[in-house]
Amino acid sequence: MSRSDTEPDHAGERRSLMRVLVFAYACEPDKGSEPGAGWVWSRMLARMGEVWVITRESNREVIEAALPSVPEAGALHFEYVDLPRRARFWKRGARGARVYYVFWQVAALRRARRLSQAISFDLVWHLTWANAWLGGLAPLLPGRFVYGPVGGGVGMDWNFVTVLGIRGAVFEVARALSRAGARFLNPLARLPWRRADLILVQNPETRAWLPARHREKALVFPHIVVEEGAGWMGPRPETPTKNALFVGRLLPWKGVALALRVLVLLPDWTLTIGGDGYDERRLRRLARRLKVEDRVAFLGWLTPDRVHDLMREGSDVLLFPSLHDEGGWVIAEALATGLPVVCLDRGGPPAIGGSGVPCKGVSQTVAALAQAVVTAAGRATGGFPSIHSSSVRLQSILRSRFPALSFAETWSPPMES
């Protein structure tokens, strides 16, 4: 039984506030990427009104453990939905997970329709796994519909295909064909664009990828949000040698091959790589071929605490030359520690706050990245997307788009003792 099945009637002062029904397939506290976005954005919405979140049954334990400790708990209600155990085999691999997700949406839609019979929702919101070429079923519900933050619009710059390796190049060709086909042939992709009253997109490329008639209702709003108390700002300790840090999956499109080439141009620097993935073997071979293997440390998968330690004390720059990241949770985490970020001027990282280097072919881009790394080292970072600042901005957008709705007063974070 879900939390909302057992709770008493809500306090009278919240009854007049907006009621939001959220589809958040991924939603887990203390996580990055999509699960973290589902949790933090649900909390942000609960600062403005009453929120019902439909998520996976597998998320129940961690959500119920964390919920009592968050100040928005009284306005958050979770409904847990999953497919029968015999259908779980679909989740094997990335493609299988997408198939499973489509069927999960059918089950979530059934639960949402039952909820809508008992509760009049002001907004229906497709929150996580919002992919512009995958789509969703949430807009089939009555009422105003908000879609996003949506990703999926960042394409490949084919000038960089030579740094991907054969497997990476094949993946990019398949991805490009899938994106093109889904845009024109997938009715589930077109449905949210058409029905949305507001579309939030993670980056400018995704807004440009939408059909022109839908772009005027799309705003750039990255889904990356850092919780209060997650910043480690302050004077950064001196490091004995200059070190660039990369954190992420070791996949060809993540751009680690570019980072290794940058190291060739920076003989006084080292590179620490945190993450694992199938591209690691190729990257180790490349480091040997470039004669930089003695200045590269492959650390494998790292715990969040270890990542934060490296950001705070062991690095001078986060070098994140991803070729088509929609967001990049690690960008916000680095900025929160005061670590400067150097990235390509593509997709989500520069929208979050990274220093974006224009893409002008491999050699020119590598040289520009090297110069940006040297310039960024020791430079103070700007702000980062906290849950408070993002909540204030989001409420301003919603008030403008939906003036008839009733919102709670702008939230102020509790003072730390």
Task: Locate predicted features.
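A conserved mid-protein helix/loop that constitutes part of the nucleotide-sugar donor-binding site
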Residues: 36, 242-265, 278-284
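Membrane-proximal helix-turn-helix segments that form the acceptor-binding/catalytic region
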Residues: 40-43, 110, 153, 168-199
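Donor nucleotide-sugar binding/catalytic pocket of nucleotide-sugar-dependent glycosyltransferases
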Residues: 77-79, 147, 178-233, 411
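Short hydrophobic beta-strand element within catalytic cores of glycosyltransferases
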Residues: 317, 331, 340-343
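Aromatic "clamp/platform" in nucleotide-sugar-dependent glycosyltransferases that forms part
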Residues: 323
